[in-house]
Amino acid sequence: MKFDRRITDEIYTSDTVRLGENAFQAMQETIYHNGGVGTITGYYDAELSILSVSDLLLHNLNHSYASLMEQTKGSLKNLFYKKDATFLDNAHFRQIKGEGEGRILTADGSPVYVRLYKEDVVDTNGTPICIMSV
């Protein structure tokens, strides 16, 4: 008897087409380095807008996609615990690559410590995006 140990995960986004193949390859890379419990992608705009979030991350934070987007106002800046969010300054955040630690907020607002792994790619329009396994 064989068991399929692969875990499948849904990716929620407002624009699937924009992620592109290189984004999915970068997601695999971040998961490889972090053992990934979920992924989240975002843009390097003023608000660090959330592009996509995996179902597994939503589950671990006790969120639905709608509730996460409402709580964070669609911004990575509002996902992280404010006292730990100094690295989310746009210029600094662009320079970060690889692994780190931080605290993100669950649905009830409680901060939880997480390991992060961040990679940068571009979407299908050539716009830079970040991909993190959390």
Where are these regions (language model features)?
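PAS-family sensory modules
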Residues: 1-49, 124-134
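Short, flexible coil/linker elements and helix-boundary hinge sites characteristic
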Residues: 15, 35, 62-63, 70-73, ...
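Residues that form generic nucleotide/phosphate-binding pockets
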Residues: 30, 79, 91
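Structured N-terminal alpha/beta-domain signature
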Residues: 41, 53, 57-58, 76, ...
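PAS and related sensory helical modules
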Residues: 49-51, 58-78, 85-86
